[in-house]
């Protein structure tokens, strides 16, 4: 037994520093209930846009406030209750906002203007009479109107009197008219020449200018009973030529018959004489 106790005593001081520190930390938390002023970087920094008290405070600070509240005897409230209290306070206090007024062609801006006074101003503005529109004409518009009224447009339908014109002016007008006529004629000639060239270029075949005076070569005469020579056309002769050839053939046959009859008569006469 004595040997076992000695072994236990020898093994007791062999505990690591980590276990000792953990045991000490647990005792400290049981006694204090928080880490105190020790910052371990485990909390989030408070957001600047939401400045609500107690929402993003360090855990040590929250516990300290919680204990202080209990010590004074105040009832403990949750985070939702605190938000409601802050909202009630903001509603109870009279609000102030920015006020913008358009008056007399100017813009007036007031910062932190109370709401009650703004409502009073709106009521006074409603009771006031509406402002009549004032027609303000600038001097530039007046000058333009005067210039328009002074301008007189001539009537083009009325004939112009040449009696008031001097001789030099009349001669100048006549020369201008002659020049204009010559220019018009020249432009017309150029236009017709271009039109003619375009028509010739677009035509599918070459236009023969002497088409009305064209003379066709004479047709060759057809002679019956002669063979066709080289280079002559073998076209069919007309019906009149065929009739003439047939009549000519018939006349030749009749002549042969007449000759035969005459020969027969002459032979009979010789027989009778003998």
Swiss-Prot record:
Q: Which organism is it from?
A: Arabidopsis thaliana (Mouse-ear cress)
- Protein name as it appears in the record: Protein TIFY 11A
Gene encoding this polypeptide? TIFY11A
UniProt KW DNA repair keyword: no
- What does its UniProt record remark on the domains? The jas domain (182-206) is required for interaction with COI1 and Pseudomonas syringae HopZ1a.
* Function, as annotated: Repressor of jasmonate responses.
Q: PTMs?
A: (Microbial infection) Acetylated by Pseudomonas syringae HopZ1a. Ubiquitinated. Targeted for degradation by the SCF(COI1) E3 ubiquitin ligase-proteasome pathway during jasmonate signaling.
Task: Indicate which residues form the motif Nuclear localization signal.
Answer: 183-190
Q: Where is this region: Disordered?
A: 49-95, 139-176, 206-274
Listed Basic and acidic residues bias regions:
249-274
Keywords in alphabetical order? Acetylation, Coiled coil, Jasmonic acid signaling pathway, Nucleus, Plant defense, Transcription, Transcription regulation, Ubl conjugation
Q: Does the keyword Nucleus apply?
A: yes
Record PROSITE patterns: TIFY (PS51320)
Which InterPro entries did the record assign? Answer: CCT_CS, TIFY/JAZ, Tify_dom
State the compartments where it is located: Nucleus
